[in-house]
Amino acid sequence: MVRLGRPGRQTGEVRILSIQSSVAYGHVGNSAAVFPLQRIGHEVWPVHTVLFSNHTGYGAWRGPVVAAADVREVILGMEERGALAQVDLVLSGYQGSPEIAAVVLDAVERVKAANGSASYACDPVMGNADSGCFVDPAIPPLLREQVVPRADVITPNQFELGSLTGLLQDSARPRIAEILDAADAARAMGPSTVLVTSVAHADQPEDTIE
């Protein structure tokens, strides 16, 4: 087992700074990401952006958005321990406020300044086809204009890909070629890799998802 602060690491281990939500009920954000990544051998350092009872797609929830200043303090404390220079990947998900988004981007800059080979993977959480948009209305344009252009990898679902690019708006089940065109449009925004999740397209049976 590799311990925080020790110089050695296991073969293939990636050290991940995961800045995401945490929920008590269900599995999203850090509540979904941390254990699986640890289980396959990676070192994950979670920083929570919200502490919610459940994810906001339910329409009602309780618990606080962590103040952006507090998220920043946690990251600065890690920087003071020399941890940011060890980070290989910054992973971000649900961003509870525009202020937290700014803190995430600052963390990405700090990590890349300390480790020039580090990457940033952004899950641009905005909503889904069933629930529509369930984030602060200020978040989608911020993701589109500031966050996604600075990401190396993005992992939108089909709804989020359409929201980012303005494409895929006319059909709930577009052709696969249209989805690939939207992914190309997203790559043109900045990230080199676009991984689209929860795809439902016209070329597949209606009772399946990809």
PLM regions and their residue ranges:
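Conserved phosphate/ATP/ADP-binding segment of small-molecule kinases
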Residues: 133-210
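Conserved N-terminal subdomain of the carbohydrate kinase-like
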Residues: 2-122, 126-129
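Intrinsic structural disorder
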Residues: 1-2, 14, 37, 158-162, ...
